[in-house]
Amino acid sequence: MINDGLEKLKTSYAENEIIEGEYDVSLSSKCYNGTFVGKVEDDVIAFKGIPFAKPPVGELRWKRPEKVEESKNVYQAYHNGKTPIQTEWKTERASYYRQGEDCLYLNIWVNRTCKDEARPVMVFFHGGSYGWGGTADPLYDGHNFVLSHPDIILVTVGYRTGMMGFVDLSYLEGGEDYPDAPNLGLLDQIEALRWLNQNISSFGGNKDNVTIFGESAGGGSVSILPIMDEAKGLFKRVICESGGLALTSSKEECKPFTDMLIEHSKAKSMKDLLSMSEEELMAVNEKINMYNVFPQRDGRLIPENPYHAYEEGKAKDIDILIGTNANELNYWVGELGGIIPYRFSMPIKFENDIAKLDEKNKANVKKFMKGLSGHSIWRISEFYNEIMFRLPSIRQSDDHKKNGGKTYMYYWTEPSGLKFRKACHAVELAYVFGNLDDTIYTGDRGDEQFAQTVQQMWTNFARCGNPSTDDIEWDEYTVENKETMVLCKDCHMENNIKNNQRELLSDLLDKFINPIYASLSYNVPFVWKSIIKIFLIILIIIAIILIIF
C-alpha cells in the first residue's frame, strides 16, 4: 500500500498543451523549439516539462537523442515530463509518476527578482543506480533552492534509464546498428546540455558558467561526462555527490543484463524488440529492472579506463567538487527491508565477494576489518563504503589534481534521524535542495542553518569555483594531504581521513576498474536468496521442534 504522497504522484500527470490565446509574457521564455510559459510562486518561476530532444520512440528507440524540432508555438510548461521506464520502488518516488519512453524533458527554476542576464546555471542529474529516478521526485523540486539563491538558475534533467538507457544490444541480430545503446542515458544528458547551451540565455542564464551536479548514478554521470569528447565545452564545473567512476562496466560485464532482456522478451533480433509495444517493454522491465546496469567503457564514447583519462588530463580544465557520506551503505538497511534482512544477507555477500580475491588482497581485507570497531555488520558496511564510494572518489581526485585540475573534497557526517541510517547515501539531498520538510532520507527535519551553509558552499562553487563561505575556508585538495571538508553542523577541515584504511584497499581499485562484486541494487538477487535461505532454516527448526515436542 503506497502512501498518500505516492498516490498523488500516480494521479498528477498531465500533458503540457499549446496556448492559443493570451498569456503572461513575463512568465515566458522564447526558445528555438517554442515559447514556454511557466508558473510563478514566491517570485520563483518554474518551467516544467520542456522537451530538449525528439521523443526517443518508434525508429528512435535505442538510438542516440536527436535535436528537437524548431517551433514557433507557445506551450505550457506546467507539468513534469514522464518518468523513464522503471519498476515502481518506494524510495524512488518518481517511479510512481506516469512512465514512458517519451521522457526527455527538463525543468528550470528562475527567480524573477534577479535582473542579472548572465546568471550561473546549475544542472542536476538524478540518481537511482542508472535504473530508476526522474524529475518528478519532490526531493528535486528547485523552488526553495532558487528562492534562497536568486542569482542561480537551477535545472533538473530526465534521461533514459535501465534497459532503455544502458543496455548492450550488439548480441542481437541487427544490434550492430545500435552502438550507442549502452550509454544512451549519458548521451541524453549531453543533449540536454546542448539544448541549454543554445537556450539558457533566454532564461537569464550564462551558458559559459554551467555547473553539472548529481548524486549516486547522477554523481557517476557527472564524473564520466568530463572525459567524454561529445560533452566538451558544455559545462565548466562538476559537483559529484556519492558517485565517482567505480560503477562502470566492460562489454563483457554488460552481457548478463542483455541475456536477461533476450530471455524475458523472447526477442531474437532487433526487429523483434522494435516491434514490442511500450506496455510489453514495461512488462519485461519488471522482470529485469532489479539488476544493476552501468555505463559501458566502450573505448569510443567512454575511455576503457576512466581513471587513466583523468590521469592523462582529459578533464583538467574542469573544476571538481567531490565527496561521499560516512555511512553510505546504511541506506540499504531501508532498501533491503530493514535491519534483520540486512544483518543476515550482508555477511553472505561479503564472504562471496572476498572469495573472489587473490591471497594478498584477502589478507589486506582481513587486516582492514580487524582495524575497525563495532559490530561485524557495520564493519562489513564500512568495507563497501570504502570500495564502492570513498576510495574511487579519492583516486579520481588524485588523478585530476596531478594534472592541475582544481579539486575540492568533502566527507559528510551529519546523520539521518532514521534508525540505523547514520550519514547514509542520499541523506544530503534535502539539505542541498533546501527541501527540509522532505524527510524520506533524513527522518527528521534537518537543521536550517546547516542547510544554508551547504547551499552556500554549492552555489559559491558554481559562481566562482571556490566553495568557501564568509565563515568557513575550504582548502583546495592536494594529492599529498588530501584536504577534506567534514560536512556537519560543525564544518571543519581534516587531512588524510582514514589514511591507513585507504592504503590497505588501494590495490583493489587497481585490480578492478569496476568493483562489480561490491555493487548493490534495490532488489539484488543475493539478498532475496539469502532471505529465502534464512526463512527455510527457520521453518526447518520450527518443524524439528514440533516433531520433538
Stretch-by-stretch model annotation:
Residues 2-186, 207, 441-454, 462-473, ...:
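Non-catalytic accessory segments of hydrolases
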Residues 45, 100-104, 187-194, 220, ...:
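A structural signal for well-ordered alpha-helical segments within the folded catalytic domains
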Residues 89, 93-270, 308-332, 402:
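Serine-hydrolase-like catalytic core of hydrolytic proteins
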Residues 122, 153, 190-193, 197, ...:
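Non-transmembrane alpha-helical segments in soluble domains
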Residues 160-162, 213-217, 411-419, 473-481:
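Short, solvent-exposed turn/loop segments enriched in Gly/Ser/Thr/Pro and often Arg
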Residues 272, 278-448, 457, 534-543:
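Substrate-gating cap/lid region and adjacent catalytic-acid/histidine neighborhood
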Residues 547-549:
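Juxtamembrane boundary at the C-terminal end of a transmembrane helix
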